[in-house]
Amino acid sequence: MRQAPGETIAEPARRIPVYGHCDVLVAGGGPAGLGAAVAAAREGADVVLLERYGHLGGLSTGGLVFWIDRMTDWQGRLVVGGIGRELLDRCGRDAVLGPPPELWGAQEKEAVAYWHIRASAHRGVVTWAPTVDPELLKCVANDLVREAGVRVLFHCWAVAAIAEDGQVRGVICESKEGRFAVLAKVTVDCTGDGDIFAAAGAEFESDVEEATIHARVNTSFRFGNVDLARYLDFRLHQPQEHATLMRQAVAAGVELRVHATPYDSVALFMTPKFSGYSAIKVADLTAVEFRSRDAMRAGLAWFRAHVPGFERAWILDTASQIGVRHSRRLVGVERVTLSRWKAGGRSPDSIGLCPGLTPEFPTLEIPYGCLVPRRLEGLLAAGRNLSCDPQAHNPLREVPECWVMGQGAGVAAALAVRQAVPPRRVPVPALQATLRQQGAIVGA
């Protein structure tokens, strides 16, 4: 293809049909969007949820990022409740791999060693960071939106904001039916990339530190027909041999890390992670898809030949959704910074919690203001496109925190509609009280 930098065409003006009106429109059905839609509907709002794929859950399901890191703090206290906890509970024990509550916060050597190789013990502490069956999680997500009365539209992509005089009134979607508009009193951008607030003219940031993990992109995959118990036993009882084997893999160009899953025959891989790519450039995203699958095939051959438990493994699936960690971040009325976090992390307008990065960090109270644009009205943003600095972004982009922010944004949107006020004018005490009624853990 011959590139054409600077060349443009004129798109003729046309009338766009209005698909419908609603109280709250949620763009994106990932963890944040699911939380927002269900929370708003449970408060009586008429909610429409738009999702470009054919399932809910976003990266936690279609992206195969079903390692839910973390639901507890370093002392073993549950810090994520509400809709996130409900989703995991409704998946059932057989579909969720993680330590029982009596071990949360444990520091005994044997417990830490056992759960460390199952990704639920870090820095010498057992945490509740479970892995979950992504297909069952999709089904449970469907149950929640249907029970709440959310109107879901799959296979349509919110591509533009409808904004007049600084007021967002809805979005324009593309679909197999063609282009249409959905109008709303409050719109919640849960696209992950801030597509709607960027299109509406909100200020945003996109700077990252290239050496950090959240500057990297990959497509996750799973191997089937694995003897996972044998592999985990080898890793637990022969740690030096395992470490040597993984160094040999890296030397051979295979940089894969095994994640345990709820099922003994399935292994998850969320590596290798590729840096130097933009999550909002199609050529870069395409390159990552090719590189990820090349790495998967090479990794399968090496693991079959060298790694205990993988002798008869085969490719089970690859993620339908690419694993993006960072793109755009809102410039909000408040901004979470690492220095603020280190200083105590308290927020009078807290909507939920995020466990500290390390045991030395306090639990962060996530401020409502980091979901509110500095200037635009009628819009909230929730998920990894929140308002924060690059250093604080890494833990805040995780699935549990997206559930938390989504639920906070959904309740706020419903209250804004009920009280006929802009989202930035929603009374914080009422917001926090309603979140607690929904089972959320608001304050540390």
Explain the meaning of each model-derived region:
Residues 2-5, 45-46, 52-160, 215:
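Conserved N-terminal/central alpha/beta ligand/cofactor-binding core
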Residues 20-22, 177-186:
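Core beta-strand elements of the Rossmann-like FAD/NAD(P) dinucleotide-binding domain
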Residues 27, 182-192:
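Short hydrophobic core segments
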Residues 24-47:
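N-terminal Rossmann-like FAD-binding beta1-loop-alpha1 element of flavoenzymes
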Residues 103-131, 135-139, 147, 207-382, ...:
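Mobile, glycine/GP-rich and aromatic-enriched active-site lid/loop segments adjacent to catalytic centers
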Residues 189-203:
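Flavin (primarily FAD) binding-site architecture
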Residues 162-181:
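Conserved beta-strand-loop-beta-strand element in the redox core of flavoprotein oxidoreductases
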Residues 1-24:
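Extreme N-terminal leader/targeting segments of oxidoreductases
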